[in-house]
Amino acid sequence: MIEKNERRWLLLFGLVVVLITSIPYLIGFATQGEEWVFSGFIIGVEDGNSYLAKMFSGYSGDWLFKTPYTNFPQEGLLTYLPYLILGKLTSPPAQQEQMIALFHLFRVFSGLLMVGASYAFISLFIKKIVLRRWATALAVLGGGLGWLLIVLGKSDLFGSLPLEFYSPESFGFLSLFSLPHLALARALLLWGLLWYLKEIPQASKSSLWQKDKVGIKIGLLWLFMGFFQPLYIVVGIGLITAHLLALSILAWRKTISWNQCIAFSRRLIWIAIVSAPMLVYNLIIFSTDPFAKAWTAQNTIASPHIFHYLLAYILLLPFAFMGLKRFYSTDRIRASFFLAWGLVLPFWVYAPVSVQRRLAEGFWVALVISAIYYLDAQKEKPLWFQ
């Protein structure tokens, strides 16, 4: 339960975060001159300009995405819809400036939602308010030890930069800083997982197809999430499926009842049914449309060498292990969700797909919760959290 004073702190923290992350952009606009014009982007400039191109397409009347960077025949894809809609809110003169301003308003809005969703999800498991705040700050702003490679002059170790510098899904800050559609998608993913774990379904002998209101609500939320990043629906359903497998093991060991597993299965079924239209559309279009297939072939988001993931997460892993051990002793159903997430992650990020790295979405938040839970379970707060 989030109290009123927590909401005030959360709003203030969110505003401070989006203000600080806006400073580099404000400096860019303030220092442009007659000889050069600030593009509106600090990192990922090519991606940023592509978002502006999508907004121009929206202004021109398009409701489906067609890239302007090729003359390959295109029917249009139901993707990047938020940017197409933003473009429809602009008009000459100074249209590019309007688009850049709308992009950053979208970034601020998405950043606030991401901060709020992270805090809400964390609060379900962490009871001490001061630790909730530290965990939220770490979840949205934190990183691993990748910076050490930069200091040591090994920035291209194993052929890639440290994950902190280019992978928004591995942590979170880059989404908040420059990729609003991913920040908003993470917020929706976390809210769905929050609803899934907050209301534990009651064990019963009811039919597997009995309506589950929570499952329907999550399905609708994730269906909407699909307009921002459809792959996160796969992540969410995949996580719940992994959790169900973990619960089945618990039931087999007679730690929980099989009826409890059936109740969770019912919830998963309704989530999948309601969010399925977006998944089915993408599956069909990206396997049959020639342009979509060609676009997917070049859209490679591969995971780096495993050393980079170890360097990214090694600092929290020991605390997360101890935290999960304590968590499991008090709440096996919820703890098994985080345990399942950690076990499937290595297989996901090296699965034979072109978007490996995207499948790490949200894991950083789970790792932070598991690590902070160890501190939360202590009877005395550490001095540095007083």
Regions from the PLM with identified roles:
Residues 234-235, 355-380:
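Hydrophobic/aromatic-rich transmembrane helices and adjacent perimembrane loops
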Residues 166-167, 186, 190-191, 195-223, ...:
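Short hydrophobic alpha-helices at membrane interfaces in multi-pass membrane enzymes
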Residues 343-356:
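Transmembrane-helix signature of polytopic, lipid-linked glycan biosynthesis machinery
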Residues 115, 119, 123, 190-201, ...:
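Hydrophobic transmembrane alpha-helices
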Residues 47, 221-332, 353-355, 359:
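Transmembrane catalytic cores of multi-pass membrane glycosyltransferases
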Residues 21-190, 194-197, 230-234:
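Active-site lumenal/periplasmic loops and adjacent helix-entry segments of GT-C-fold
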